[in-house]
């Protein structure tokens, strides 16, 4: 708890960080006690500004391309020195946190930020350990200086902002970025590169535990329901977004949640609603005159967010981890209305759909996607965060599923009765009913019906869910239109899957024409 003379605030309390943020005009307090900030022209992640330093340890291990862009080591050193010197000349904030809750797999991180609110954000999302780095591991450094402006011609960046990962030096440089989600996802990408070397599968998923100790994983892209569906009052939350699956354990990479706020309601999302209080950060949420958040207002962005520590969730796993998963759920938001509310997958189908990562970008977290909705394929349900070739993660998933005997399901949180604009979206209570049936074990060994074209098996009955919803063809008034839509979706799957070199058994597990 030191405050140096040159205004370097080190490991000060969350309350003090809120105080400093208010004092510096970085944000304002909402009626619910949370700190409300605006992130400027970037209200989501900026994938075109993210780089990985190319050096001997990464050169042959990373799937280089549009997602993982190489950055020269000498340019990195020059830019780090420039940003560090700039930051040292102004007040800044330092916190010492962990990334990874399991003792064997945590990374100690020295997090330096130019703003108090981004330091508070990091304290919400990363893990505040009782003792910092007890194992004496090599320390990672995150340097996040939002008010530094990069000069592309000089710095080698793509714009005025950048996110650069350097594995050789254990450094993450974030400059010119006010959207704090960049910091969280940068450290996730670091763990996603490192964990497979330890035979641990890193996952873009939520996880919770039942009273009996049974664990459920929810894979899915932003807006498909990971945070909402894992925040279940009848179960204990492990985490809402980033986990590792090793032998005997599923552990949270983080110590907090980053929930989408658009149209948030106490009725539909009571756990999240209650968690947004003093110590939490609201990004790009509009307040009324009484300082009450208006979660329906998307005038700043569809991607408004709440960051809060897991301590704000009443029912949570105290250790921030659990055993291996009984149920693995792939959440997909299907815009075509073709996919059923729930399908039961075998191991080959699990590999196929994990590699495909079919879903929609709903109120996307990425810059430039706007409020529009479009279909996408995102490998491993999180392509932007997985630096290694996709096969590395798929092989680990199948290895883990086989070893533990986890059951795998594909759950559609998107449209039924027609595509987007014609049909309607499954409501949250219906999807919660599907999840409850999965978690109760009611679908294990259930009688199924096979759906041709999309090549999926659906249960004939799901407790608590209307039977006529289970086969999506039945929900369409025009059956021929459904068949055409199914063929169209199958074509998309087949086209996307051409890039993967996998066994014939896995190829045959997807949609067929």
Curated annotation (Swiss-Prot):
Residues binding Mn(2+), per UniProt: 185, 204, 241
Classification via Pfam families: PEPCK_ATP (PF01293)
GO BP field: gluconeogenesis
Record-listed substrate binding positions: 45, 179, 185, 305
Enzyme class of the recorded protein, top EC level: lyase
Residues annotated to bind ATP: 185, 204, 220-228, 269, 305, 431
Cofactor(s) listed in the protein's UniProt record: Mn(2+)
Gene Ontology MF: a single term: ATP binding
EC number from the UniProt entry: 4.1.1.49
Metal-binding among keywords: yes
Pathway: Carbohydrate biosynthesis; gluconeogenesis
UniProt keyword NAD present: no
Co-factor binding details: Binds 1 Mn(2+) ion per subunit.
Database matches in SUPFAM superfamilies: PEP carboxykinase N-terminal domain, PEP carboxykinase-like
UniProt keyword annotations, A-Z: ATP-binding, Cytoplasm, Decarboxylase, Gluconeogenesis, Lyase, Manganese, Metal-binding, Nucleotide-binding
InterPro entries given in the database record: PEP_carboxykinase_ATP, PEP_carboxykinase_C, PEP_carboxykinase_N, PEPCK_ATP_CS
GO CC annotation terms, alphabetical: cytosol
Domain of life: Bacteria
Alphabetical list of CDD domains matching this protein: PEPCK_ATP (cd00484)
Catalytic activity: oxaloacetate + ATP = phosphoenolpyruvate + ADP + CO2
Compartments reported by the entry: Cytoplasm
Subunit structure: Monomer.
Family as reported in the entry's similarity comment: Belongs to the phosphoenolpyruvate carboxykinase (ATP) family.
Function: Involved in the gluconeogenesis. Catalyzes the conversion of oxaloacetate (OAA) to phosphoenolpyruvate (PEP) through direct phosphoryl transfer between the nucleoside triphosphate and OAA.
Matching NCBIfam families: pckA, PRK09344.1-2, PRK09344.1-3, PRK09344.1-5
Name under which the protein is recorded: Phosphoenolpyruvate carboxykinase (ATP)
Organism in which the protein naturally occurs: Pseudomonas aeruginosa (strain LESB58)
